UniProtKB/Swiss-Prot annotation:
Stretches the record annotates as Disordered: 276-366, 415-449
Species of provenance: Danio rerio (Zebrafish)
Signal peptide: 1-38
Subcellular location(s) of the protein: Membrane
Record's protein name: Neurexin-1a-beta
Length: 449
C-alpha cells in the first residue's frame, strides 16, 4: 500500500477517511458507468401496466420437443393405409417401446397403429379404439397383455393425444391430460410353479435349468425382429380408421413425416391424404372445456386445417393453441426411469410458442440520450468532489501534528538556558567551576584596613 506519510499512516479518523476515499476513487466511477450502460446507450426501459387475467391451460408433464403438432394425414371413408417397412438387415429387437399419436375420429371401433414382427414370431403391438375407448394390446412372447383407458370416450370428434410406453411386460397409457394408467403383470403363479419344479430338478442339472430360464425370461420381454408399422388399419377383415392422425412417433421414427418426404421405405395406399404441402403442417383445433373434468380440450373438425407460416423477426408470429403442442411430446411421452432415455437424434428441446396477446400495448422504449449522459456526468463530478474534500481534510489533519512553537525572548525566566525554535533546551558548558576555584583562593587571603 502507498504510504502518504513518512512516519506511517495516522490512526483513528485519518485512517478511516483514507480507506473511504480510496474505495470511492476505485469503485464509484466504474459502477456508475456500468449501471448507465447496462440498459444500452441512451435508452430507458419504461414498462407499462399490463392487466392480468386467468387463462386456462392444459400442459403435459412430458417434455415438449417440437413447435407444432406434426405432419397430419386424413383417412377417408374408403380407408387408407401408411406402411413403414424396416430394411431386412436393420430390423430392431427392443426391450422398451414408445408410441404417441394425436387423432380425431367418430368411430367406436378402429385400428390406429399396429407394429408386427417377422412371420413366425407372433410379436406385435396394436393401438386401437374399442367401444369408444383407447386400448393397447401387445404380445412379446407370452400372452396378450391389455391396457385400456375406460374413463373417457375418444370417438367424440375432438382432438385427443395418446401416449404409450412398454418396458418388458410392464406398460403405461395416458390419454390427453388424464392420469397415467400403469400395468404391471404380477407373475406370482409362474413363481410358485417354478419353486415347486425346482424341488424335483436334480442338483447337477440345476445350473443348466437356471441358465435356460434366465435366457427364456429375457426373450419373453423383447419385441423381436420388428418388420412393419401400419397406420390406418385398412386391410382385409380389419377395422379401417376414418379421421385424422397427427405427429405419430414410434421409437424415434416419425413415420408421417417420412411419408410426406417420400421416404422409399414408406408407402401410402388408399384414401390417406396429406394435409398441406409441407411436413410442418399443423392442426388448429377449437378449444373447449369439458364439464366433467373441467379440463381444456380441443374439438377440431377435419376441415379446420391450416399450415404453419414463417414470420420475420419483427413481425407477428402465427401460433397454434397449447393443446396442439402436446402432440409433439410424443417424442418423449413418459418420464419412467425403467425405460431407456429418449433418442437425442429425434429432436432438440424447444420452448412452445405462446399465444399472441391481443389488446395490450407492448412496453415502450424511450430514448433519452442527453438526460442519461448528463446524469452520468453529474454523478462522476459529485464523486470527484467528495474525494477532493476528503483529501483536503486529511491534509489538514496531517499538518496539525507538525506545528511550531514561538518563544518570547523578552520574558526569559531561565537566564542560563536557551531554547531552540521548536522549544528544545540547549545544554551549555558549566562556567561555575573556575569561579569556585577563584573563590577558594580569595578565602585564603586576608585584607587588613
Amino acid at each position: 500500500m502507498l504510504r502518504l506519510w513518512p512516519g506511517g499512516a495516522p490512526g483513528g479518523l485519518a485512517s478511516i477517511l483514507l480507506r473511504i476515499s480510496l474505495r470511492l476513487a476505485l469503485w464509484l466511477p466504474p459502477l456508475t458507468l456500468g449501471s448507465a450502460l447496462a440498459e444500452g446507450p441512451g435508452e430507458l426501459y419504461v414498462p407499462q401496466h399490463m392487466p392480468h387475467h386467468l387463462v386456462p391451460a392444459a400442459r403435459s408433464h412430458a417434455p415438449l420437443r417440437a413447435g407444432h403438432a406434426g405432419t397430419t394425414y386424413i383417412f377417408g371413408r374408403d380407408g387408407g393405409l401408411i406402411v413403414y417397412t424396416w430394411p431386412p438387415n436393420d430390423r430392431p429387437s427392443t426391450r422398451a417401446d414408445r408410441l404417441a399419436v394425436g387423432f380425431s375420429t367418430q368411430q367406436k371401433d378402429a385400428v390406429l397403429v399396429r407394429v408386427d414382427s417377422s412371420s413366425g414370431l407372433g410379436d406385435y403391438l396394436q393401438l386401437q379404439i374399442e367401444r369408444g375407448n383407447i386400448k393397447v394390446v401387445f404380445n412379446v412372447g407370452t400372452d396378450d397383455i391389455n391396457i385400456e383407458e375406460t374413463s373417457k370416450f375418444v370417438n367424440d370428434g375432438k382432438y385427443h393425444i395418446v401416449r404409450f410406453t412398454r418396458s418388458g411386460g410392464n406398460a403405461t397409457l395416458q390419454v390427453d391430460d388424464l392420469p397415467v394408467i400403469e400395468r404391471y403383470p404380477s407373475g406370482n403363479i409362474d413363481n410358485e410353479r417354478l419353486a415347486i419344479a425346482r424341488q424335483r430338478i436334480p442338483y447337477r442339472l440345476g445350473r443348466v435349468v437356471d441358465d435356460w430360464l434366465l435366457d427364456k425370461g429375457r426373450q419373453l420381454t423383447i419385441f423381436n425382429s420388428q418388420t412393419t408399422i401400419k397406420i390406418g388399419g385398412w386391410e382385409k377383415g380389419s377395422r379401417p380408421f376414418q379421421g385424422q392422425l397427427s405427429g405419430l412417433y414410434y421409437n424415434g421414427l416419425k413415420v408421417l413425416n417420412m411419408a410426406a418426404e417420400g421416404d422409399p421405405n414408406v408407402r401410402v395406399e388408399g384414401s390417406a391424404r396429406l394435409v398441406g404441402d409441407m411436413p410442418s403442417s399443423s392442426i388448429t383445433p377449437q378449444s373447449s372445456v369439458s364439464a366433467a373434468g373441467n379440463r381444456s380440450e380441443t374439438s377440431p373438425s377435419i376441415t379446420d386445417i391450416t399450415t404453419t407460416t414463417a414470420s420475420n423477426r419483427q413481425g407477428k408470429q402465427t401460433t397454434t393453441p397449447q393443446d396442439d403442442l402436446l402432440v409433439a411430446s410424443a417424442e418423449c411421452p413418459s418420464d419412467d426411469e425403467d425405460i431407456d432415455p429418449c433418442d437425442p437424434s429425434s429432436g432438440g428441446l424447444a420452448h412452445p410458442p405462446l399465444p399472441e396477446a391481443k389488446g395490450y400495448p407492448s412496453p415502450e422504449v424511450i430514448r433519452e440520450s442527453s438526460s442519461t449522459t448528463g446524469m452520468v456526468v453529474g454523478i462522476v463530478a459529485a464523486a470527484a468532489l467528495c474525494i477532493l474534500i476528503l483529501l483536503y481534510a486529511m491534509y489538514k489533519y496531517r499538518n496539525r501534528d507538525e506545528g511550531s512553537y514561538h518563544v518570547d525572548e523578552s520574558r526569559n525566566y531561565i537566564s542560563n538556558s536557551a531554547t531552540q525554535p521548536n522549544g528544545a533546551a540547549v545544554k551549555e558548558k558549566p562556567i561555575g567551576v573556575p569561579k569556585n576555584k577563584k573563590d577558594k583562593k580569595n578565602k585564603d587571603k586576608e585584607y587588613y584596613v
